[in-house]
Amino acid sequence: MRTPAAVAALMMATVYVPVARAGPDDYVATPGVEYGEREIELRFGTASKSGDDRESAGSIAFGYGVTPSWFTEIYGKFNRAGSNATRFDALEWENKFQLSEPGEYFVDMGLLVEIEWPHDRAEGYELRIGPLFQKDFGLVQTNFNFLLERHFRSDEREVTELGYQWQVKYRWRPEFEFGAQGFGDVGPWNDWDAAREQSHTLGPAVFGKLPLGGRQVLKYNAALLFKASRAAPDRTFRMQLEYEF
């Protein structure tokens, strides 16, 4: 899995894996894996759009670095629409594979594979898969990922959709870094929606890592995203906390 040919084969395979719009608590995945790391993660996001109910979502997860190149995580996901009560939404199993060592190639590469079992069985189950890329320019870190998503055994027509996520950050200090993030969905991977129907958001973001002693670290990142297309929410606030030990 450490050669460009193998990485390219995995990337091409994602095109043939038989997405929904990015949720307000979605995050930008990075390709690195820490062997032996244990993690408790909290995510939250809320999005508003004129004429629609506010949508909020959150999750709690436990993850573990099983090998130097494989990190696995189990999520319990919750959501709330408008004034309705918060409800359990889904169980998700996420796996991240580091495909190259930092600096081994022009870009660092990884692969994300997620399987989700929605509480509403009419939604079937969901698979999301795609390559992760990172490139550093001195103190500036850039990430770009494109992800394919599809529901199986659902009551709705099954379509493979294409989404993306990106971020740029300046590593000013470990405890405080700043930059920008963006998320988007273009519709079916082989027949994109009209521009007015696509969802694109972007906005400023902050990041940081606070040492707690020993191997214990508290990481955070948060972003305030604004619509960059007609179909996107007007504003989205998202945040992520990770306690690593």
Language model region names:
Residues 1-28:
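Cleavable N-terminal export/targeting peptides
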Residues 21-245:
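Transmembrane beta-barrel domains of Gram-negative outer membranes and organellar outer membranes
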